[in-house]
């Protein structure tokens, strides 16, 4: 173990603190606000408080990420959406009224590849690339009530859309990434290039990770490769040259 994170609600705000484990794994102590580099010689870092807040508050919706209806609707044990609905404790924080959510509409659409990829992007990217003001106007999170793959925000904001803020990066084939998601061509998709990088200023997620998530990368890659490669042809994007 390297780190435990504790979050709680105070009188008017969220508070959070990271605890670093001792080398003998018998105790923890509050990590310094600047974080810890190469914690216990693992090659992994405990992020600084500033780095933590860059994600835990990005959209202004809430400080907690990874705790929403879509992610809780599973059968893997522990706390689930079904538990919260049964207890009657699930509420819409913006109105105080019971949330209009059910086990039927809190689902990811599409086939198995699409559901896996949308779930991964929602949980790992959608908290910054989502909400009322998504980063780079790219929506990678999903919403309750989706019934078809075309309903997913990524289909409108990333598939066949030109890259922004990351132009001129060379891909595996000596060319340049131009589209965020190039249907049928994961190797040409900027989102894959970002996920594959661990270069500061290029990698995604931008903080809190210094190793590529190979399983997640393969999941998103498989979905992009399964998309119809001609889906951009009806309205080909005119992207500026790198």
Feature annotation, model-predicted:
Residues 51, 124, 203:
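The −1 position to Zn-ligating cysteines in a subset of zinc-ribbon hairpins
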Residues 9, 74-118, 127-242:
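Electron-transfer interface patches adjacent to heme c in soluble/periplasmic c-type cytochromes
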Residues 22-24, 68-70, 123, 176, ...:
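Generic signature of intrinsically disordered, low-complexity segments enriched in small/polar residues
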Residues 1-119:
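Extended surface/linker regions that mediate inter-domain or inter-protein docking
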């Amino acid at each position: 173990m390297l780190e435990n994170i504790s979050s709680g609600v105070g009188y008017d705000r969220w508070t959070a603190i990271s605890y670093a484990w001792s080398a003998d794994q018998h105790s923890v102590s509050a990590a310094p606000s600047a974080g810890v580099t190469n914690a216990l010689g693992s090659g992994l870092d405990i992020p600084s408080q500033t780095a933590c807040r860059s994600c835990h508050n990005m959209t202004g919706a809430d400080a907690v990420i990874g705790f929403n209806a879509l992610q809780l609707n599973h059968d893997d044990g522990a706390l689930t959406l079904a538990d919260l609905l049964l207890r009657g404790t699930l509420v819409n924080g913006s109105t105080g009224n019971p949330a209009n959510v059910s086990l039927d509409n809190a689902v990811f659409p599409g086939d198995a590849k699409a559901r896996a990829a949308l779930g991964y992007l929602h949980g790992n990217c959608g908290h910054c690339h989502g909400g009322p003001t998504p980063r780079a106007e790219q929506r990678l999170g999903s919403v309750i009530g989706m019934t078809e793959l075309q309903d997913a925000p990524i289909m409108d904001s990333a598939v066949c859309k030109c890259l922004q803020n990351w132009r001129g990066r060379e891909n595996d084939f000596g060319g340049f990434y131009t589209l965020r998601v190039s249907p049928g061509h994961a190797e040409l998709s900027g989102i894959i290039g970002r996920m594959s990088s661990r270069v500061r200023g290029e990698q995604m997620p931008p903080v809190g990770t210094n190793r590529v998530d190979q399983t997640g990368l393969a999941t998103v890659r498989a979905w992009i490769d399964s998309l119809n490669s001609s889906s951009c042809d009806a309205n080909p994007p005119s992207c500026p040259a790198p």
